[in-house]
Amino acid sequence: MYKYRQFGDRYVLSIDNHEEIVSAIKAFCEEKHITIGTVSGIGAVSEATLRFLDPAIKNYVDGVFTEQMEISNLIGNISTKDGELYLHIHATFGRRDYTCIGGHLMSAVLNGACELVVEDFGKGTVGRKFDPETGLNLYDFSVTEA
């Protein structure tokens, strides 16, 4: 599913071709017991599901894109919600015509390479709690352990 090398509190991670990226990141974090940190990377995909929050209705709209695209930016944070690992990842994808699409990354199927850096902030965590005003799962700093 992936290969990696550790450098201090950071991991350089390469996900295997044709794997689903979000699932691979989650599996890696679970294997390494990472409950607070960040992830960033680049790569290429053949399919991606992105999510956009419409603040007027406090509801998400998903879009599925099935085309070869470059990951021009993938960035996110790692925390927990209700004691479970919670990934909040955004991505920007470059299309063949040099336009870009982006949003909250729900899933993406790798087609080429996916090279990531995962930083582990160490023991503890920051939780998440639903905020009815925004419709978002926001940081909950009262949670300190996963």
Predicted regions and their residues:
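N-terminal intrinsically disordered, cationic/polar leader segments
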Residues: 1-88, 92-146
